[in-house]
UniProtKB/Swiss-Prot annotation:
InterPro entries: Cu-oxidase-like_N (IPR011707), Cu-oxidase_2nd (IPR001117), Cu-oxidase_C (IPR011706), Cu-oxidase_fam (IPR045087), Cu_oxidase_CS (IPR033138), Cupredoxin (IPR008972). The lineage of its organism: Eukaryota, Fungi, Dikarya, Basidiomycota, Agaricomycotina. It holds the Pfam family Cu-oxidase. Keywords: Copper, Disulfide bond, Glycoprotein, Lignin degradation, Metal-binding, Oxidoreductase, Repeat, Secreted, Signal. GO terms for molecular function: copper ion binding; hydroquinone:oxygen oxidoreductase activity. Disulfide bonds join C103-C561. Homodimer. Lignin degradation and detoxification of lignin-derived products. PANTHER family: LACCASE, MULTI-COPPER OXIDASE. Cu cation 4 binds at H470, C523, H528. Residues 1-18 form the signal peptide. The keyword Zinc-finger does not apply. This is Laccase-3.
Length: 572
């Protein structure tokens, strides 16, 4: 990994504060890897999976040069990178979703994403946002450190070793899985933590060669930054014999909240402090999948104070018995729902319940009588708590109903399955000459215009009849989740996220339209996104084109579409 930093004086700050420009080079290529012991072709970042940690400090500017060296004709050969959770103020052109904010990067070309970080801090991640490509390995962690972190007194260690990127893993390429239309193939074969896992954990030794190992010293406190980079899997995370104190969710600092375990959906991040206060030994880091049967991820926590040779943890790891609703989901039948498109650009543009195996102290420390699982509704923001609209009604309420067409296999919002346009939404807005209206977008683009400087509430419900939780992600914003299902609303101190779980019972959240850009809203189950579970909100389109919050684009951004338009029709 190539990385350089240099200091740039920023005269806009009062007291001559210095901000850095932090540069990275990411080479995207194909290669064979076996993170769970089974070899397959994958899409790699700098030769590995997951990609390297990208990190910077509050106020820095990130410059990431992405080089496309993809060659495998059986996998996706163009690419595009999304920086999940970065707000991208005046910078929507570098948000990354293909055909929303940019054209893909073609093979043997490069593109440099330049991203001023402003006041953002916290745990994020980056991944391909071209079709289902990130399922094949193109994903990695991203952390923005805060030199004045309000939680700094709660932990001693916060470094690259305490970043845990967890994710499901497949032995078949995502392109091949989608081509079959067989939903059962969307179940992952295994899961990894920091690129290590066991396909057959009952018959594969648990040791530092097969599992990620976090070494700790007794008496020290460690800030874990847990990232769920999955295509579908949700996990329940715990550490054998240890409690954790949650201090952030999706990059938002929260009031400290002590738990024994927490659930984490695809796309979400949880920061939690664990104190190494047990007897020096080896302990399981457990992460059973909660929406896929008989799959689990593990890592090892080893005390450096333990002078004995390596020995595995006492007792088996945790497993999970999925609910009847999850079993029903994996048994349901639907048609082929792939909505790829993109082939016409050249012509258009030219230019459940826990199942414990073995000793109960795997979950509960000795003498404990209860196990505390994180309640998401108790994640209170540390700074500026309260709903975006305050105690007043929202200026605009948008009702969104998701569901699935069991005949076609398409997931839909308000009856429309999203299909990526041939021309990126941002380019269409920037080249419009007579005022952007919703009629400028085709029905499959499913694009709604949001007025600027309003408080908006999304009311999202489902009618699929399938009991799976959909992780809903909105680009360009964090939002305040004011109601989960039929629970009482909370406008005083609701959780603030950028990914929230939605069932058919629904979820409501609020945000202010203070960031002009075309922002993608979609299910972060990548299979559902590919089957149409998405739409675009064109926020303040006239402000995108001109004014103090406009989105300036450069020649290299424009060249992306020129180069992509020269590819053969259907090349992706």
């Amino acid at each position: 990994m190539a990385r350089t930093t240099f200091l740039v004086s920023v005269s806009l700050f009062v007291s001559a504060v210095l901000a850095r420009t932090v540069e990275y080079n990411l080479k995207i290529s194909n290669g064979k890897i076996a993170p769970d012991g089974v070899e397959r072709d994958a899409t790699l970042v700098n030769g590995g999976y997951p990609g390297p940690l990208i990190f910077a400090n509050k106020g820095d500017t990130l410059k990431v040069k992405v080089q496309n060296k993809l060659t495998n004709p059986d996998m996706y050969r163009t690419t595009s990178i999304h920086w999940h959770g970065l707000l991208q103020h005046r910078n929507a052109d570098d948000d990354g979703p293909a055909f929303v904010t940019q054209c893909p990067i073609v093979p043997q070309a490069s593109y440099t994403y330049t991203m001023p970080l402003g006041d953002q801090t916290g745990t994020y991640w980056y991944h391909s946002h071209l079709s289902s490509q990130y399922v094949d390995g193109l994903r990695g962690p991203l952390v923005i450190y805060d030199p004045k972190d309000p939680h700094r007194r709660l932990y001693d260690i916060d470094d690259e070793k305490t970043v845990l990127i967890i994710g499901d893993w497949y032995h078949t390429s995502s392109k091949a899985i989608l081509a079959t239309g067989n939903i059962t193939l969307q179940q992952p074969d295994s899961a990894t933590i920091n690129g290590k896992g066991r396909f057959d954990p009952d018959n594969t030794p648990a040791n530092p060669n097969t599992l990620y190992t976090l070494k700790v010293k007794r008496g020290k406190r460690y800030r874990l930054r847990v990232i769920n980079s999955s295509a579908i899997a949700s996990f329940r995370m715990s550490i054998q014999g240890h409690k954790m104190t949650v201090i952030a969710a999706d990059g938002v600092s929260t009031k400290p909240y002590q738990v024994d375990s927490f659930d984490i959906l695809a796309g979400q991040r949880i920061d939690a402090v664990v104190e190494a206060n047990q007897e020096p030994d080896t302990y399981w880091i457990n992460a059973p999948l909660t929406n896929v049967a008989n799959k689990t991820a593990q890592a090892l926590l080893i005390y450096e104070d333990d002078r004995r040779p390596y020995h595995p943890p006492k007792g088996p790891y945790r497993k999970w018995s999925v609910s009847e609703a999850i079993i029903k989901y994996w048994k349901h039948k639907h048609g082929r729902g792939l909505l790829s498109g993109h082939g016409g650009l050249k012509a258009r543009m030219m230019e459940g319940s826990l199942h414990l195996h073995g000793r109960r102290d795997i979950v509960k420390r000795q003498n404990e009588t209860t196990t505390v699982v994180m309640d998401e509704t108790k994640l209170v923001p540390l700074e500026h708590p309260g709903a975006a609209c305050g105690s007043k009604p929202a200026d605009l309420v948008i009702d969104l109903t998701f569901g699935v067409n069991f005949t076609t296999g398409h997931w839909m919002i308000n009856g429309i399955p999203h299909k990526s346009p041939d021309m990126p939404t941002l380019l269409k807005i920037l080249t419009d000459t007579d005022g952007v209206t919703e009629s400028d977008f085709t029905q499959p683009e499913h694009t709604i215009i949001l007025p600027k400087n309003k408080c908006v509430e999304f009311n999202i419900k489902g009618n699929s009849g399938l009991g799976i939780v959909h992780p809903i992600h909105l680009h360009g914003h964090t939002f305040d989740v004011v109601q989960f299902g039929n629970n009482p609303p909370n406008y005083v101190n609701p959780p603030r996220r950028d990914v929230v779980g939605a069932t058919d019972e629904g979820v409501r959240f609020q945000f202010k339209t203070d960031n002009p850009g075309p922002w993608f809203l979609h299910c972060h189950i990548d299979w559902h996104l590919e089957e149409g579970f998405a739409m675009v909100f064109a926020e303040a389109p006239e402000a995108i084109k001109g004014g103090p919050k406009s989105v300036p684009v450069d020649r290299q951004w424009k060249d992306l579409c020129r180069k992509y338009g020269s590819l053969p029709a259907g090349f992706l």
